[in-house]
């Protein structure tokens, strides 16, 4: 009978440990990084070869932020920091959000002339963290 009691006690203890381990949420497994450095954006001029054909390949790099398709107030508390890009061309009244990690912005069918591209690194709710503008002249198609 003593062996049976020990076996049942071991099974009960194992069940309690397994239950508490599986009840731990994913959020509690993430340790936030205190005092994260500010995001940094590096933008290069468009590649000259494609630009001669009216296509702008604008290389960029973001540090201290992961570009991801997430949004909303809860995502502001994710660590390491997440966000996305807002791209505005020639001061037009609209922009688009870029959630990819291609590190290149591609603009096609650019008309001849001067162009300006504003690239903003934003938090999950669209608040601007840093930005750069690249200007260039397109020979057009």
Each predicted region: which residue ranges?
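Short, compositionally biased P/S/T/A/G/V-rich stretches that sit at domain boundaries
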Residues: 25-56
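Short amphipathic, basic-aromatic surface patches that mediate peripheral association
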Residues: 61-77
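Short beta-strand elements bearing conserved aromatic residues within extracellular beta-rich modules
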Residues: 85-87
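Short beta-strand segments within Ig-like beta-sandwich modules, predominantly Fibronectin type-III
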Residues: 94-101
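Short acidic/polar inter-strand loop motif in beta-rich domains
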Residues: 95, 123-131
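Surface-exposed, short loops/turns at beta-strand junctions within beta-sandwich domains
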Residues: 107-113
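Short beta-strand edge segments in extracellular beta-sheet folds
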Residues: 135-141
């Amino acid at each position: 009978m003593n062996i049976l009691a020990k076996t049942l006690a071991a099974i009960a203890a194992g069940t309690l440990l397994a239950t508490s381990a599986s009840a731990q949420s994913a959020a509690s497994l993430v340790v936030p990084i205190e005092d994260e450095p500010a995001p940094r954006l590096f933008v290069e001029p468009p590649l000259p070869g494609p630009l001669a054909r009216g296509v702008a390949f604008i290389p960029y790099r973001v540090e201290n932020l992961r570009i991801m398709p997430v949004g909303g107030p809860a995502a502001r508390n994710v660590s390491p920091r997440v966000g996305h890009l807002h791209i505005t061309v020639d001061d037009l009244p609209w922009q688009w959000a870029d959630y990819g990690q291609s590190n290149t912005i591609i603009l096609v069918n650019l008309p001849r002339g001067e162009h300006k591209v504003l690239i903003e690194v934003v938090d999950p709710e669209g608040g601007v963290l840093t930005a750069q503008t690249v200007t260039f002249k397109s020979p057009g198609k």
